[in-house]
């Protein structure tokens, strides 16, 4: 659709800082560039969760404030029961969100015939937990144990739906 009803302007890469002052500075620069370019719409993604959710929401809010329509593309982590707030930060401007799936979903992984490496650290990995390894060699763990399983760039077919 580029050149017909949409014009792709480009990609803005920004970092996800640890300190609040750096987060503010980075998101200020993103919004300033969006305003300078006269962009009507923005897709904002993030990598990670928790602390990076603040960067996501700051970018959303500030791009909205300079007049851009914003759609967030992110994964969610609402806890094993699915009832917790799925993103660690929020802003009222975040009113259009595409979910790439939820990383806390517990998945059953059948036993493998051959294992390369060790299972010694599975229970300590993100997504693993004490007791996730079963006696028959299978495993029940959160989806996020598979690195990039819910990557917020949308390279998968996972989604979270609200009914």
What are these regions (language model features)?
Residues 1-163:
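Anaerobic metallocofactor- and corrinoid-dependent redox/one-carbon enzyme cores
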């Amino acid at each position: 659709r580029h050149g017909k009803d949409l014009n792709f302007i480009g990609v803005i890469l920004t970092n996800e800082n640890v300190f609040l002052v750096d987060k503010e500075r980075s998101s200020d620069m993103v919004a300033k560039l969006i305003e300078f370019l006269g962009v009507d719409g923005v897709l904002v993604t993030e990598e990670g969760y928790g602390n990076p959710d603040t960067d996501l929401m700051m970018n959303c809010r500030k791009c909205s404030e300079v007049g851009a329509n914003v759609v967030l593309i992110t994964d969610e982590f609402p806890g094993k029961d699915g009832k917790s707030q799925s993103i660690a930060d929020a802003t009222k401007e975040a009113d259009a969100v595409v979910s790439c799936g939820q990383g806390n979903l517990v998945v059953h992984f059948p036993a493998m015939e051959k294992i390369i490496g060790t299972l010694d650290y599975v229970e300590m990995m993100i997504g693993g937990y004490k007791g996730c390894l079963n006696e028959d060699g299978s495993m029940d763990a959160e989806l996020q144990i598979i690195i990039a399983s819910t990557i917020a760039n949308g390279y998968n077919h996972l989604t979270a739906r609200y009914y």
